[in-house]
């Protein structure tokens, strides 16, 4: 896997290429992910069925801003009302035929609400978990032992969490 770091104004952009990718990609998916760190722990989403961790988030819907997307996604997946306080960075991830544009926001918790999972999230057993940040970095740092699609995701998350520690 190859990584390139650039900037767009103040926003750092990390471009990662999986072992297998198309350039140009067949499709692009723009999404947002929230980073919440509290008492040395980071909030992650766990897909129990696949035993896969990732930062909570998902795709931007039509007419939605990036900030609105991260607020909605953390509400749906984690049952949290959040306030995005900083657009930390963007990770452009080329994996197979898709370019995944992941916008990461540092968020603060502003309350709780009811979770609303998609059918797919229900099926995969998506749930919010708080994990010690060092343990999360270790989990994601094992990306080379994963199959290619998960390795790409774990490298992305590993890169982002290390940026949060700086």
Residue locations for each model-derived region?
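Conserved Nudix-box catalytic region and its N-terminal flanking loop in Nudix hydrolases
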Residues: 32, 37-76
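Active-site-adjacent beta-strand/loop module that shapes the phosphate/pyrophosphate-binding cleft
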Residues: 93-116, 129
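Short loop segments at secondary-structure junctions
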Residues: 39-41, 108-113, 133-135
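A short coil-to-beta-strand element that immediately follows conserved catalytic motifs
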Residues: 81-89
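Nudix hydrolase/Nudix homology domain
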Residues: 121-166
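Acidic, metal-coordinating catalytic segment for phosphate/diphosphate chemistry
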Residues: 1-33
């Amino acid at each position: 896997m190859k990584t390139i770091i650039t900037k767009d104004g103040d926003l750092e952009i990390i471009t990662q290429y999986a072992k297998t990718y198309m350039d140009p990609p067949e499709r692009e998916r723009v999404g947002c992910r929230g980073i919440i760190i509290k008492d040395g722990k980071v909030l992650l989403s766990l897909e129990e069925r696949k035993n896969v961790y990732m930062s909570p988030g998902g795709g931007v819907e039509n007419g939605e801003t990036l900030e609105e997307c991260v607020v909605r996604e953390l509400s749906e997946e984690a049952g949290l009302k959040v306030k995005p306080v900083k657009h930390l960075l963007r990770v452009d991830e080329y994996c197979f035929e898709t370019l995944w544009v992941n916008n990461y926001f540092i968020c603060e918790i502003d309350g709780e609400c009811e979770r609303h999972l998609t059918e797919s999230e229900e099926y995969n057993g998506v749930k919010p978990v708080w994990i010690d940040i060092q343990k999360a970095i270790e989990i994601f740092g094992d990306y080379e032992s994963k199959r290619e699609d998960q390795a790409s995701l774990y490298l992305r998350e590993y890169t982002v969490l290390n940026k949060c520690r700086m």
